[in-house]
């Protein structure tokens, strides 16, 4: 089974409550969920929330919501909590809640990557990285090596060696076991 999980943490640091911020008359995460639900290759889509306020703002939209701990260090940890209860999941797609313009084709393409049994995890990047993007700390930059492996993610690249630099798209994908291995890794000090 292929599962999409949208982690939606209310207490975001840079823009608190952004997931329920009004975007054309509805909470931003609603647009994200509507996009993810259009993916052809997902069997199930779950919204992973962490507050009653989020639940109250979204309950009338009919999404499959799971209340998660407020104590997670990352959205991926929130996804792991949800997926732990779905052991029949083979491929897990983690789309960040603040991606209302996510291209559903990217989701389906990432699911297709897992036809190769050697693939355990991945993400999406774009070559479209402008000078403004480079200077914007709100844009996550993915630094990749010559084999197209991501070696780091950065918001601020001022202290970085410029090499294979791409714009990161807020989506990750994992096999079930890889998700839990990843969520058990020590956190970066950054």
Which positions does each model-derived feature cover?
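Conserved core of the sugar-phosphate nucleotidyltransferase
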Residues: 102-188
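Short glycine-enriched, charge-decorated loop/helix-capping segments at active-site entrances
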Residues: 19-23, 66-68, 188
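Residue-level signal for inorganic ion chemistry
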Residues: 29, 98, 175
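Short, high-confidence coil segments that cap the C-terminus of an alpha-helix
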Residues: 42, 88-89, 116-120
């Amino acid at each position: 089974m292929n599962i999409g999980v949208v982690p939606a943490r209310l207490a975001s640091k840079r823009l608190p409550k952004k997931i329920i911020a009004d975007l054309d008359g509805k909470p931003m995460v609603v647009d994200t969920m509507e996009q993810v639900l259009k993916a052809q290759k997902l069997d199930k889509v779950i919204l992973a929330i962490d507050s009653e306020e989020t639940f109250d703002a979204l309950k009338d939209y009919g999404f499959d919501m799971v209340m998660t701990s407020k104590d997670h260090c990352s959205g991926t940890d929130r996804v792991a909590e949800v997926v732990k209860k779905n052991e029949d999941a083979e491929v897990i797609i983690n789309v960040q809640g603040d991606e209302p313009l996510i291209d559903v084709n990217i989701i389906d393409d990432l699911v297709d990557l897992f036809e190769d049994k050697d693939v355990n995890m991945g993400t999406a990047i774009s070559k479209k990285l402008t000078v403004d993007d480079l200077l914007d700390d709100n844009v996550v930059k993915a630094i990749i090596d010559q084999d197209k492996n991501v070696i780091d993610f950065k918001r601020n690249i001022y202290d970085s060696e410029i090499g294979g630099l791409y714009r990161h798209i807020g989506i990750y994908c994992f096999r079930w076991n890889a998700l839990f291995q990843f969520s058990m890794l020590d956190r970066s000090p950054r």
